[in-house]
């Protein structure tokens, strides 16, 4: 996800970790087993130029199974819950750049 225009990186991280995260925890509790935020940092591109990342945070939410994921989705779509989440998202994110994916993990054993 990308921070809203006009918000600095430190402001974004502070808001996310002190406010938005708490909303996530409130509604994910009892469904998700992990709620992880991975904040991005500037990185060198192939030309050796330091570039700001396209996105500011990647969010991972882990569920124990498909049924729990679906139950959480249903709970999050309740009108009062969806309204609270959306209103806070608009304070911190550039919602034009919000993306969501359901993924499967494949891990290599490198030992």
Identify the role of each PLM range.
Residues 1-111:
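Macromolecular interaction modules
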């Amino acid at each position: 996800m990308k921070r809203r225009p006009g918000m600095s990186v430190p402001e974004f991280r502070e808001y996310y970790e002190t406010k938005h995260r708490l909303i996530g925890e409130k509604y994910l509790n009892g469904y998700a087993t992990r709620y992880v935020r991975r904040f991005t940092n500037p990185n060198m591109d192939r030309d050796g130029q330091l570039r700001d990342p396209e996105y500011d945070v990647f969010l991972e939410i882990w569920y124990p199974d498909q049924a729990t994921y679906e139950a959480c989705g249903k709970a999050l779509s309740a009108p009062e819950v969806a309204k609270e989440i959306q209103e806070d998202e608009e304070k911190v994110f550039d919602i034009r750049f919000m993306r969501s994916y359901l993924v499967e993990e494949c891990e290599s054993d490198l030992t």
